[in-house]
């Protein structure tokens, strides 16, 4: 999507369910073997009571949205802030959303709000991405 066709307020979304296999694969790739994500017996002893999805695995959905949908192919991820508000449990479905909030006039750069919602609609992750447009 070109800079000329982007508008403030445009959104893109995708939904995904992260099961135990995806969480284990991410643990292996990231070297984050925290038992809070992988061990139901350990997680049962915590405030969460069951395994939670890695926050960065959730945030990886933003990369897919930005690179494939909005702005799309050829865009370059320049930065991302994140705030983790609620846990997402292994096996739960989430919806990731990006929304264009600003477009620079002097350069092909967009700022987007990034959010992940739980299957119940609560805000689990929020942040802001800066992307160079193709």
From Swiss-Prot:
The keyword Cytoplasm does not apply. A (3R)-3-hydroxyacyl-CoA binds at residues 32-37, 55, 84. Keywords: Fatty acid metabolism, Lipid metabolism, Lyase. GO terms for cellular component: fatty acid synthase complex. The keyword Cell inner membrane does not apply. Changing residue 32 to A: Almost no activity. Residues 5-119 form the MaoC-like domain. It holds the Pfam family MaoC_dehydratas. One of its GO terms (biological process) is fatty acid biosynthetic process. It catalyses: a (3R)-3-hydroxyacyl-CoA = a (2E)-enoyl-CoA + H2O. GO terms for molecular function: (3R)-hydroxyacyl-[acyl-carrier-protein] dehydratase activity; fatty acid synthase activity. Its EC number is 4.2.1.119. Catalyzes the hydration of trans-2-enoyl-CoA with a chain-length of 4-6 carbon atoms, forming the corresponding (3R)-3-hydroxyacyl-CoA. Homodimer. This is (R)-specific enoyl-CoA hydratase.
């Amino acid at each position: 999507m070109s800079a000329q066709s982007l508008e403030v307020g445009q959104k893109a979304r995708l939904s995904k369910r992260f099961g135990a296999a995806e969480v284990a694969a991410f643990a292996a790739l990231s070297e984050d073997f925290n038992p809070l994500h992988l061990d139901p017996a350990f997680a049962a002893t915590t405030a969460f009571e069951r395994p939670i999805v890695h926050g960065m695995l959730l945030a990886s959905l933003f990369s897919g949205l930005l690179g494939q949908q909005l702005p799309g192919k050829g865009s370059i991820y320049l930065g991302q802030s994140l705030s983790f508000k609620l846990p997402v449990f292994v096996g739960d479905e989430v919806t990731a959303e990006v929304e264009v909030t600003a477009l620079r006039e002097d350069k092909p750069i967009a700022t987007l709000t990034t959010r992940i919602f739980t299957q119940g609609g609560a805000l689990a992750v929020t942040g802001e991405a800066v992307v160079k447009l193709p």
